[in-house]
């Protein structure tokens, strides 16, 4: 490139720079002018005229044969809908008339219209109450007595479930319970026309009507419309319902039609077929209940802190009674020893027949054979342990520590078979872990400061959540998928660590309680599995969706 070409290029660049500077200067001037014009327009009428002043001004200008605009006529007339007003583009524009203190809108044709009531966007009082007005937490003032009874499969401590008690007043978005953080309502045709061609959610409801054969009605003999001999109380509708928005339908009975009513909702996964018996020709209100009123996983009401990051979210399990057992493990041994089966806690009464819990506190007379009843004896509860070979004399407890280790000679049982009120002799305790001779009775050592007692003589409800070995939220924890009452690796009051020889265990650490007052032990064996040697971390890998490391097989939970 010679000098001439270089000079030409430099001149072109200088010219471009000058033009760009001029362009920027003009743009800044225009922006400044626009701002000044807006400020000037806003400052033209600093004082709002009253009705009388404006009307007088219009009358004087009428007498002077001056031009009067339609907007000014609007100050003294009420027939706003007849006044065509346009802003020049036919676009809806908002005006505020100070005379009557009302706001009017202009539609696309330029006519004024009255504003719509914003019932479905702002005024939601008839859908669900404000969250801050709800006091149905389990740890509210009054404790359990202030908590309503929710039924068998409903997690206690939730916010008032409108869909259960007042289904017609409940927001259809919240089938079980409203969360403490209200999400955006689904836009549907019921909330106005704002979703027109905007991809708003509209449930696809399809009706399939299949004519029935007349021979299916006894004694009908082909008579049209006459169902003689057919009992009105046994008309059957096949109604396939997907729970969700618009799943509550009033279905008019049609005598000769088989109505298959399908409601598709992409937000839900349950699909249940209901056979509804129609007692007559009256409409049937089909209100399917949610399978279980399950709170959203990981989203608990605000007063509770989130779960520890090491443990997975805990779903509501039907293995646990519908009432929370306030059976927090005592920090110290109780001052009295209780007979077998006695639970020193006031448990609420539950109607759960499948998983019953102690519902009353028994009173024992002073002639009890418990160690504390004998003067001079220690108040420390004592549990004798005997080998399972003598199970005929000492039957096993209801919940052995490990159901697969039932024949293990090291198995410890919970029943306290105290035959006298005195402390048993400590001389026949076998050395080490050797089993005792059949028929002999030996006890745990007396508690010391460094060695607290291992087994209390009262039974405590399970203090862990019985998950499968590898927790998977997609597997329901109900029969036949129920885990055994005590997993082989748990470490609670009723487990014998020496008896579990099937696999090694790590000591369970008590973590903070999840919502609704349950105490559980976090056992890493229930949530961790070994990782293959090819992995960078060859020790263990958490199976928790709260794990920030991203355990691949369980990211979908």
Curated annotation (Swiss-Prot):
It is found in: Cytoplasm; Nucleus. This is Uncharacterized protein C622.15c. Residues 39-62, 101-127, 356-402, 536-557 are annotated as: Disordered. Its main location: cytoplasm. Residues 101-110, 358-380, 390-400, 536-548 have a biased composition (Polar residues). GO terms for cellular component: cytoplasm; nucleus. Residues 2-45 form a coiled coil. It comes from Schizosaccharomyces pombe (strain 972 / ATCC 24843) (Fission yeast). The keyword Transferase does not apply. Keywords: Coiled coil, Cytoplasm, Nucleus.
